[in-house]
């Protein structure tokens, strides 16, 4: 299992608008690609001194090919839509993680 994690810092005064957009549109658009099997949204529980609130948006994929297809075919348009809607009001970084299985 792979985890494509997007951590977003959003200005406090745009937080509710951003949450509405993410939960009603963006996350659904990503999931509707059919390339991820599950998504989760977490709020980061520490105060930011720069006036932002941080969230982790997590998308789970079965294999690297699905993630690569998403990044090549769908991500450019979806990222640009998000950027335009919240221009100069957010920062985002993306991380791809592979599950490490162990006993315990």
Language model: regions and residue ranges:
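A short, structured loop/turn motif at beta-sheet edges
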Residues: 32-33, 62, 103-104
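A generic structural signal for secondary-structure junctions
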Residues: 35, 72-75, 83, 87
């Amino acid at each position: 299992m792979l985890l494509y994690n997007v951590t977003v810092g959003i200005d406090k005064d745009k937080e509710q608008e951003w949450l509405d957009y993410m939960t009603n549109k963006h996350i659904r658009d990503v999931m509707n690609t059919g390339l991820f099997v599950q998504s989760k949204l977490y709020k980061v529980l520490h105060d930011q001194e720069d006036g932002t609130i941080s969230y982790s948006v997590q998308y789970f994929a079965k294999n690297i090919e699905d993630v690569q297809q998403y990044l090549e075919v769908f991500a450019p348009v979806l990222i640009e839509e998000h950027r335009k809607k919240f221009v100069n009001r957010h920062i985002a970084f993306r991380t791809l993680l592979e599950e490490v299985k162990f006993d315990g």
